[in-house]
Amino acid sequence: MSEYKSVQKGSLKLKGVSLPSKKKKKKNKEMKRLEEQVLTSENEEGTKKAYVDKRTPAQMAFDKIQEKRQMERILKKASKTHKRRVEDFNRHLDTLTEHYDIPKVSWTK
């Protein structure tokens, strides 16, 4: 085991590559600057102009109709109770053909 006493333990050290130095902590100047920016932005929000709508008249009409149709769909769905909806669904299923039933096959007739 004495042959291994001269072996260097630890990470390899490469030539031309310096060790990464520890970064210094930023002082409170950064925090103070951020707080000032927040305060000034709050003051500017009150003085900003209102939002200018840049949509074309066709786009505005389309959005209005979409909203109207969505409200109609919501009112239509809200008009039926769950019980009524289940009854309608069962009635619909009764009218469908039954594809998955096993057909009766008789060899005698």
UniProtKB/Swiss-Prot annotation:
Keywords, comma-separated and alphabetical: Apoptosis, Cell cycle, Nucleus
One of the GO BP terms on file: apoptotic process
Subcellular location: Nucleus
One of the record's GO cellular component terms: nucleolus
Pfam families named in the record: FAM32A
Chief site of localization: nucleus
Compositionally biased tracts (Basic residues): 21-30
Compositional bias of kind Low complexity: 9-20
Top-level taxon of origin: Eukaryota
InterPro entries linked: FAM32A (IPR013865)
Region: Disordered, residue numbers: 1-48
Function: May induce G2 arrest and apoptosis. May also increase cell sensitivity to apoptotic stimuli.
Family, similarity comment: Belongs to the FAM32 family.
Protein name: Protein FAM32A-like
